[in-house]
Amino acid sequence: MRIIVLGSAAGGGHPQWNCHTPASLRAWQQADGAQRRTQASIAVSADGERWVLINASPDFRQQILATPALWPQQGLRHSPIKAVLLTSGEIDHIAGLLSMRESQPFALHASRRVLDLLAQNPIFDAVNPQYVSRQPFTLNAPLTVSGLQLTPFSVPGKVPLFMESRSGGDLAGSQEETLGLTIDDSQHRVHYIPGCAAMTDALRARLHGAELVFFDGTLWRDDEMVQLGISQKTGQRMGHMSIDGPEGTIAAFAPLNVARKIFIHLNTTNPVLNTQSPEFATARASGWEVAHDGLEIAL
C-alpha cells in the first residue's frame, strides 16, 4: 500500500488567507523552514497505478501539481485517480470536486447523507453524472475499490458549517455526518480519521493495536482560538478533540498501543505546526508525528 498526504491542514490551509497569529506568521515568512500546508486529503493505492482520493480538498489542483504519481499518464485525457471517497460534507472535503469536472470518469463514494447534500446544491451538477457515478455506502460495510477494502465508520462530530443554521440546534447530526475510514490491502490496515469530537469505547476497540492511524489534530488546546482572540468557538464546538489535556488525543491514545500515529487536519493556529515549539516536542515525545504535505508512506 502507498499513501501520499496531499494536504495536511484544516479548513483554509496554513496559513489561512487572513491569519496573522504566531503560527500563521511563521508560515507566511517561512521562518526556520516553516512549511505551508494545503487542506487535508490523502491518496491511497494498492498497486501504485490506481489511486483513491480520500476527500476532495479545495486545493485539489495545487495538490495534483505537487504529486507526479497523480499526473495524467497516457492519451489526451487521463487520471490515475479512479475513485473519491468522502468522510464528511465539510467544505474542505467536497469543494475540490468542482475542480474535477472535466468529464473524467471516476466513482464517488459517500454516505447517503453527504450525497444528499451534494444533490441539494446544483453547483455539483457540474461534476457530470455521465462520467462520475455517485455510489452510496453503508457504514461498517467494506467496499472494494481499486484493490483496496475501504470500511467507513461513524465517529462523533458535527454537521458541516454551512448546514448549522438548518440543523434545528442538533449540531451533532446523524451517524453519517462525520466518518472515519479503515483502509485494508489484505496485508496492511490503516485508519484515517481527519475529524473526531470524542474518543468512544467503540473507537478505542477499533484502533487498539493498529499499525497506522491518521487522526484529527485540529487544535492543541480546546480554547486555543478563544485565547488568541480570533474566535469564540472552542474545538468541541467545532466538532474536534484537542491534542492536549486530560480528555485530549495524546491521553486518549496512550493506552491503545498504536504503532504509528500521525496528526492531520491541523488548524492554522496550532502551535504544534512550529517544529521548534514545546508543543511539537511534547507531541513527538508522546510518539506522535505531524503530517506535512507530500509525506509518502509505503507499507
Swiss-Prot record:
Pathway field: Cofactor biosynthesis; pyrroloquinoline quinone biosynthesis
Organism for this UniProt entry: Xanthomonas oryzae pv. oryzae (strain KACC10331 / KXO85)
Pfam family membership, one: Lactamase_B_2
Family designation: Belongs to the PqqB family.
Keywords, alphabetical: PQQ biosynthesis, Transport
Keyword Lipoprotein found: no
Highest taxon of the lineage: Bacteria
A GO BP annotation: pyrroloquinoline quinone biosynthetic process
Function summary: May be involved in the transport of PQQ or its precursor to the periplasm.
Protein name: Coenzyme PQQ synthesis protein B
InterPro entries xrefs: Metallo-B-lactamas, PQQ_synth_PqqB, RibonucZ/Hydroxyglut_hydro
